[in-house]
Amino acid sequence: EAPANAVTMDDPTAQALKYHPSAADSDRVAAARPGLPPEEQHCANCNFMQADVGEGDYKGCQLFPGKLINVNGWCASWTLKAG
């Protein structure tokens, strides 16, 4: 069950960034970013995810202030987490 402040696919920012809460169902292969093979790209290993915000499968993201993203999701701004 997604929290009330989870990013939805009809969110304008989500649409602009091609965000999908399920990376497997996203455009990550066609719009793959450098750093990892497309099938390994998801929010949990993205530099923008805020691991200390939210809980469970829903965490904060610098690109969606005040909202939570699914750690299994993907968007076109995916950037490999440093370290």
Curated annotation (Swiss-Prot):
The keyword Hydrolase does not apply. Pfam families: HIPIP (PF01355). It is found in: Periplasm. Its main location: periplasm. GO terms for molecular function: 4 iron, 4 sulfur cluster binding; electron transfer activity; metal ion binding. InterPro entries: High_potential_FeS_prot, HIPIP_sf. Keywords: 4Fe-4S, Electron transport, Iron, Iron-sulfur, Metal-binding, Periplasm, Transport. GO terms for cellular component: periplasmic space. One of its GO terms (biological process) is aerobic electron transport chain. Disulfide bonds: none annotated. [4Fe-4S] cluster binds at residues 43, 46, 61, 75. Belongs to the high-potential iron-sulfur protein (HiPIP) family. Specific class of high-redox-potential 4Fe-4S ferredoxins. Functions in anaerobic electron transport in most purple and in some other photosynthetic bacteria and in at least one genus (Paracoccus) of halophilic, denitrifying bacteria. Homodimer. This is High-potential iron-sulfur protein. It comes from Thiocystis violacea. The lineage of its organism: Bacteria, Pseudomonadati, Pseudomonadota, Gammaproteobacteria, Chromatiales.
